[in-house]
Structures are given as C-alpha cells and as structure tokens.
Curated annotation (Swiss-Prot):
Official protein name in the record: Tryptophan synthase alpha chain
EC number: 4.2.1.20
Protein's job: The alpha subunit is responsible for the aldol cleavage of indoleglycerol phosphate to indole and glyceraldehyde 3-phosphate.
Reaction equations catalysed: (1S,2R)-1-C-(indol-3-yl)glycerol 3-phosphate + L-serine = D-glyceraldehyde 3-phosphate + L-tryptophan + H2O
Lineage, highest ranks first: Archaea, Methanobacteriati, Methanobacteriota, Thermococci, Thermococcales
Keyword Hydrolase carried by entry: no
C-alpha cells in the first residue's frame, strides 16, 4: 500500500471540521506514503488523551460519518495517495458492514483498520472487505505471540500495524525496547509490509524504526496535538512538524 521508508500521518476526520481536515490532508500529501484517517467515536478506548480529545471535538462540532467519505472523495480529486480508515467497530455496525465498506470504496478509501475487532472474529468482515475491494489492516502488540502474529499476517491484505507500546496512543519521549523486539519478530514472520505507530514524535524515532526494518512509520498524536492547539490555522505547523520528522 505504500513504498518502503514512508511516513504515514494520522488525522481525525472532522477535527475541527471537514474542510479543515481536507486542507490538512492536501498539505501533508507530498510527504505521505499513505494516510490514516480516523473516524470519530464517542468512546475511543484505544486512544490516548490527545486523540480522544480530537474525537470529542469533531463530534461536538456535529461530525457525521458521511463527512469522512466526503473528505476522501474530495481528496481523491487531487491525489492517489492510499488512505486507510482507522475506526472502531460501532460506526461500521450501525451503518451495516457491507454498506460501510461499499461507500468507503466508492469514495476512494484503500484500506481499513478496525481497532477493536480481534482477528479471530474478523473472518466475515475480511471476506466482505475483499469483495468490496478494501484492504484490511490489523494490529499486533508487543505481547502478541508468534502464532497469533502469523494469523494476523494471514488475515491482512494491506499492512500489519505494529503497536510500539502497551496501552493507548500518544506521543512518547522514547520508543521502548519491546517495540524493536516486536518489529524484529514481525519482519521474520510477516509476508506483508509492517508499519509502526503509537508514540512516534521525534525524528530519531522515525530513523531508528526505519533502520530496524519498518516499512513505514505512523505519526498521529504529535500532529493531532497541533490541530488541538492551532485549529483551522494548523496547516503550516503540521507541515513543519512532518518536515522535522523526515529531516527535511
């Protein structure tokens, strides 16, 4: 889904509004190997405070699911950069799995990551996604055993998303040793590309993870924090942060 060495920015759809999200995506497009677009949810348990607050801001401002598809559709008028929706299962359930995935495909979505859908319960979802032409992305954590990592890789048609730490998302000072241990195991076991996320906030994080074999690195909280502070005026600050991460 993306070339090796890619930075994969994450933004929450509708924070602070749909047009601003589109503007941010277009501004970051030249730096991105792929883009993760989060679907706001009222109980984002896998996310840390920064991204939780972005979900709440979007919902408070009246976000509706159709706005995420509008953002992707408008983005597709300008770019072919792959977009992966990152969502909890509830919005999919409410819309209906096939309806959700069909609309996602029609808007130009390439892949989907359902944060709270365990791989062992994802067979039907994965089959429908394949029928609709949407690639699936699954999470693996530092405590994921090799056998489960193999199942995750087998169910994945996009890339395997390696969670660098235990707990929720959020920028950290250091990437823990357990993240590198997981990355080495994944490179040995997985046939799909792997991207590492959760906690990436510095240039040295990106460099060390790519050097260790990650195909891509996801950065979310460090960008979402800027949007929380700058709102609609965040564009140039986002670009500056991404350039810092890439060493430009």
């Amino acid at each position: 889904m993306f070339k090796d060495g890619s930075l994969i920015p994450y933004l929450t759809a509708g924070d602070p509004d749909k047009q601003s999200t589109l503007n941010f995506l277009l501004a970051l497009d030249e730096y991105a190997g792929a883009i993760e677009l989060g679907i706001p949810f009222s109980d984002p348990i896998a996310d840390g405070k920064t991204i939780q607050e972005s979900h709440y801001r979007a919902l408070k401002n009246g976000f509706k699911l159709r706005e995420a598809f509008w953002i992707v559709k408008e983005f597709r008028r300008h770019s072919s950069t792959p977009i992966v929706l990152m969502t909890y299962y509830n919005p999919i359930y409410r819309a209906g799995v096939r309806n959700f995935l069909a609309e996602a495909k029609a808007s130009g979505v390439d892949g989907i990551l359902v944060v709270d859908l365990p791989v062992f319960h994802a067979k039907e979802f994965t089959e429908i996604a394949r029928e609709e032409g949407i690639k699936t992305v699954f999470l693996a954590a530092p405590n994921t055993p090799d056998e489960r990592l193999k199942v995750i890789d087998d169910m994945t048609t996009g890339f395997v998303y390696l969670v660098s730490l235990y707990g929720t998302t959020g920028a950290r000072e250091e990437i823990p040793k357990t993240a590198y241990d997981l990355l080495r195991r994944a490179k040995r076991i997985c046939r799909n590309k792997v991207a590492v996320g959760f906690g990436v906030s510095k240039r040295e994080h990106v460099v060390s993870l790519l050097k260790e074999g990650a195909n891509g690195v996801v950065v979310g909280s460090a960008l979402v924090k800027i949007i929380g502070e700058k709102g609609r005026e965040a564009t140039e600050f986002l670009k500056k942060k991404v350039e810092e991460l890439l060493g430009i």
